[in-house]
């Protein structure tokens, strides 16, 4: 008697068939909701967009081409941008061209710097180093100079060139050693002597070469030491004097702001005593005085007092440096100034000391000054 073949229950079979269909249906529903979320943003219905995301928290706020952050920057829609950042949108998310939201904000020009570029930069500073498919970073689109750590890259290039030169010298020494050893192989007078090993011979040649280079360098320094030493010491003195003036100006500004804060606090207390009925509005002055420790545009220690034309400030910095005849010293001096006034470095160091409503104006002036310094540096090449 043959055993009957096992039968699959009808309920299990229907369940296995429905699982792929249910997953596909859930995916299509999620995609429809994400498209509806983007339509709400485009139509300015931000409350409905936020409510939709609260009902369905698994939606991807960065989905779509172009992504929602890129669209908000292109339409100059600041409320939509703020909502997306609050909902967790990623400023480093790239579209099909490799652009991030910072790339899209940088292409909108100076008008979008405060409302779009700065909020994205504050949320994700690391996105400044992301390049698109054309090899551009957001800073390069804005016209900023090289990053402040370019001096380290130059040092790495110098180190790699030094390694290549040493490898080339080692190869030439090996070839010369082979020629010398082959020339004296048949000389019987040297058979009794201990032959010099290759390592000792190469070390001796390297020492002689280094001694010869040092001697030539000392002779060159001795022939023109007085003017070079004088120019070098003068350039360093100028740099030290400029740094001292920079620190002194910042210290004076802080003292003035501190005195102004104390004076405002005393005036607020004096006005509050005879008029107790108006104590509510007067109570706001100490808080305003507390904000006096932050810099406004005129409080920043610019190269020229109070700021002014970026070209004039750049010319003032160049005038304080070494003379134009000393091209090498002047290039090094300008590199130091480029690092000091680079927008990324300036924002990293002084952002917490500047009034929020003055930040856009200050960074605009710093960017213009950095570009002027870059032009002066390019003119020396």
UniProtKB/Swiss-Prot annotation:
Region (Disordered): 1-34, 131-167, 186-242, 256-294
Location(s) in or outside the cell: Nucleus
InterPro entries with a match to the protein in the record: Ankyrin_rpt-contain_sf, NFKBIL1
PANTHER family registered for this protein in UniProt: I-KAPPA-B-LIKE PROTEIN IKBL, NF-KAPPA-B INHIBITOR-LIKE PROTEIN 1
Species, as recorded: Macaca mulatta (Rhesus macaque)
Disulfide pairings: none
Amino acid composition bias (Acidic residues), ranges on this chain: 150-159
Main location: nucleus
Gene Ontology process terms (BP): cellular response to lipopolysaccharide; negative regulation of canonical NF-kappaB signal transduction; negative regulation of lipopolysaccharide-mediated signaling pathway; negative regulation of NF-kappaB transcription factor activity; negative regulation of toll-like receptor signaling pathway; negative regulation of tumor necrosis factor production
Name of the protein: NF-kappa-B inhibitor-like protein 1
Entry annotated with the keyword Transit peptide: no
Start-end of Basic and acidic residues biased regions: 256-287
Signal peptide coordinates: none
GO terms for cellular component: nucleus
Subunit structure: Interacts with CACTIN (via N-terminal domain); the interaction occurs in a pro-inflammatory-independent manner.
PROSITE patterns for the chain: ANK_REP_REGION (PS50297)
Phosphoserine: residues bearing it: 150
UniProt KW keywords: ANK repeat, Nucleus, Phosphoprotein, Repeat
ANK repeats (start-end): 64-93, 97-133
Role summary: Involved in the regulation of innate immune response. Acts as negative regulator of Toll-like receptor and interferon-regulatory factor (IRF) signaling pathways. Contributes to the negative regulation of transcriptional activation of NF-kappa-B target genes in response to endogenous pro-inflammatory stimuli.
